[in-house]
């Protein structure tokens, strides 16, 4: 997973609240067996509207989504994070996230930055007045900078550390590979193993 420190990208104002995971990626796309290639599924129903924000310049090149409250509610879908990331988003800003979505985001390398609704509305106003406005998201300082305005955001320390280190669940496990190997060596041979014992050909 790519480490996250500072990201600069075009802000996209999504003035919708209670955006659930079925709106982020409809269930029909969950039948795919690949891990990537979900960018076409992101907000699929809404993108059929030519006036939807992601169908307009310069927002179709945005990488920082500024959404309404209660983003990512509904069923738990890692695919929701994958679709946002595959489209190009590195950050989602909202005043409230569903707990499961926030957890999936951190594991998938997507920053879910929580800030006050007043600050979200300030960003909406600035972005709409200056289409193409680039936001600078600094995970080290937990700030979002828009022009001369610097706004704080919240993220728990553990998820912040994982993103800064670029560690997904597999990466976390591999950091302990030496300890795991030593444990396996010291494990009594009479105990069950994950690999079958070799069969003698005699």
Swiss-Prot record:
GO terms for molecular function: 3-isopropylmalate dehydratase activity. Pathway: Amino-acid biosynthesis; L-leucine biosynthesis; L-leucine from 3-methyl-2-oxobutanoate: step 2/4. Its EC number is 4.2.1.33. GO terms for cellular component: 3-isopropylmalate dehydratase complex. It catalyses: (2R,3S)-3-isopropylmalate = (2S)-2-isopropylmalate. Keywords: Amino-acid biosynthesis, Branched-chain amino acid biosynthesis, Leucine biosynthesis, Lyase. Disulfide bonds: none annotated. InterPro entries: 3-IsopropMal_deHydase_ssu, Aconitase/3IPM_dehydase_swvl, AconitaseA/IPMdHydase_ssu_swvl, IPMI_Swivel, LeuD. The keyword Amino-acid biosynthesis applies. The keyword Mitochondrion does not apply. One of its GO terms (biological process) is L-leucine biosynthetic process. Gene3D superfamilies: Aconitase, domain 4 (3.20.19.10). It comes from the Bacteria. Belongs to the LeuD family. LeuD type 1 subfamily. Heterodimer of LeuC and LeuD. Catalyzes the isomerization between 2-isopropylmalate and 3-isopropylmalate, via the formation of 2-isopropylmaleate. PANTHER family: 3-ISOPROPYLMALATE DEHYDRATASE SMALL SUBUNIT (PTHR43345:SF5), 3-ISOPROPYLMALATE DEHYDRATASE SMALL SUBUNIT 2-RELATED-RELATED (PTHR43345). This is 3-isopropylmalate dehydratase small subunit.
């Amino acid at each position: 997973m790519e480490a996250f420190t500072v990201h600069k990208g075009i802000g996209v104002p999504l003035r919708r609240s209670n955006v659930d995971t079925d709106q982020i990626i409809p269930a029909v796309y969950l039948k795919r067996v690949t891990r990537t290639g979900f960018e076409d599924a992101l907000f699929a129903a809404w993108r059929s509207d030519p006036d939807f924000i992601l169908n307009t310049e310069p927002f179709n090149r945005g990488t920082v989504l500024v959404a309404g409250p209660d983003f990512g509610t509904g069923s738990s879908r890692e695919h929701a994070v994958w679709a946002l990331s595959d489209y190009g988003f590195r950050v989602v800003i909202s005043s409230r996230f569903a707990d499961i979505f926030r957890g999936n985001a951190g594991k998938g390398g997507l920053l879910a930055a929580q800030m006050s609704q007043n600050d979200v509305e300030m960003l909406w106003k600035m972005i709409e007045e200056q289409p193409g406005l680039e936001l600078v998201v600094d995970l080290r300082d937990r700030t979002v900078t828009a022009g001369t305005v610097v706004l704080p955001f919240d993220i728990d320390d553990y998820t912040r550390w994982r993103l800064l280190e670029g560690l997904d669940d597999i990466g976390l496990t591999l950091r302990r590979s030496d300890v795991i190997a030593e444990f396996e060596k010291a494990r009594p041979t009479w105990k069950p193993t994950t690999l079958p014992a070799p069969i003698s050909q005699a």
